[in-house]
């Protein structure tokens, strides 16, 4: 008894058709490798694609800092924190949240949501919308993220002077937050909580 396979009946030499190869060619590179033009040729069809990597960088810039900030953080050390509490006249619950709470960052669409967990309560909820000034009383608050820095700046609407500024960055795996008002600056260093 012999067995025959369907595979034995295939004529491999005539069963495959040669498909025309598509070639990509880099035509132009200008402005210190920031702009490129690629040409795709397949048969008689030619397609050109222009790429401006500066536009891509602008769109992706916030991702680095925001991705790194996502998660839970606990205060590890600070400089001038008590003085900052006095300067800002923070209520005791806010002081406790800053000193002993777990700060939680998460993205929801294009917004960064932040709150602090303390004693089973969610405190100080904040939503950051990027590059959109928000009017508050006589001031405008705007948040901008680029590379490894996220800055929130409050300016007087009347004259554009800076009232206060908060800068956040990741350094050595820690979240470092600087709060500034005038010449006074407070530094907080947070460690990630697992």
Curated annotation (Swiss-Prot):
Record-given protein name: Uncharacterized protein EEED8.3
Family: Belongs to the calycin superfamily. Fatty-acid binding protein (FABP) family.
Entries under SUPFAM superfamilies matching the protein: Lipocalins
Organism: Caenorhabditis elegans
InterPro entries (UniProt xref): Calycin (IPR012674)
Highest taxon of source: Eukaryota
């Amino acid at each position: 008894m012999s067995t025959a396979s369907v595979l034995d009946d295939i004529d491999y030499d005539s069963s495959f058709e040669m498909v025309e190869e598509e070639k990509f060619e880099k035509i132009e590179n200008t402005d210190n490798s920031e702009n490129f033009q690629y040409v795709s040729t397949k048969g008689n069809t030619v397609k050109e694609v222009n790429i401006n990597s500066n536009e891509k960088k602008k769109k992706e810039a916030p991702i680095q800092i925001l991705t790194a900030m996502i998660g839970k953080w606990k205060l590890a050390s600070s400089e001038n924190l008590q003085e900052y509490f006095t300067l800002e006249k923070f209520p005791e619950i806010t002081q406790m949240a800053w000193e002993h709470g777990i700060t939680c960052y998460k993205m929801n669409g294009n917004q960064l949501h932040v709150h602090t967990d303390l004693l089973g309560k969610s405190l100080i909820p904040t939503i950051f919308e990027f590059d959109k000034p928000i009017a508050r009383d006589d001031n405008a608050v705007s948040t901008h993220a680029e590379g490894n820095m996220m800055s929130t700046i409050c300016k007087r609407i009347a004259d554009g002077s800076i009232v206060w500024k908060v800068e956040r960055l990741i350094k050595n795996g820690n979240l470092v937050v600087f709060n500034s008002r005038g010449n006074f600056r407070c530094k907080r260093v947070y460690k990630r909580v697992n």
